[in-house]
């Protein structure tokens, strides 16, 4: 199976949906932040490994604790995934912290600051010319 085949894309979507459901409703580890979401999943073409990109809303300590909690629950998550997703091999899951949402929020704030500064400068120039 090729990496970007229709079958692989469908498997990625199914694993993403089930992984999100397992993390949200079945894991009771207090280290895992309730504001945790699965952003993307990449299942290898041989179905042996899976990269799960996780986004955590919170500070850096909360993010590290969540990843640690998910790694400790990896065996349980894999068993639950095997029960819900019908695959020949249940992939070994690697959790990767995805900070793209935080990066986007930070960039948006910077753009807003520059726009606000530009507007202030524009108003000051207009006041001086009058």
Swiss-Prot record:
Protein family (similarity comment): Belongs to the RbfA family.
GO terms, biological process: maturation of SSU-rRNA
Superkingdom field: Bacteria
Segments forming a coiled coil: none
Quaternary state and interactors: Monomer. Binds 30S ribosomal subunits, but not 50S ribosomal subunits or 70S ribosomes.
Encoding gene, per UniProt annotation: rbfA
HAMAP family referenced in this protein's UniProt entry, alphabetically: RbfA (MF_00003)
Subcellular location(s) per record: Cytoplasm
Alphabetized Gene3D superfamilies for the sequence: 3.30.300.20
NCBIfam families: rbfA
Pfam name, any one: RBFA
Stated role: One of several proteins that assist in the late maturation steps of the functional core of the 30S ribosomal subunit. Associates with free 30S ribosomal subunits (but not with 30S subunits that are part of 70S ribosomes or polysomes). Required for efficient processing of 16S rRNA. May interact with the 5'-terminal helix region of 16S rRNA.
Keywords attached to this entry: Cytoplasm, Ribosome biogenesis
PANTHER family reported for this sequence: RIBOSOME-BINDING FACTOR A, CHLOROPLASTIC-RELATED (PTHR33515:SF1)
A molecular function (GO) term: ribosomal small subunit binding
A GO cellular component entry from the record: cytosol
Species classification: Bacteria, Bacillati, Bacillota, Clostridia, Lachnospirales
Name this polypeptide is given: Ribosome-binding factor A
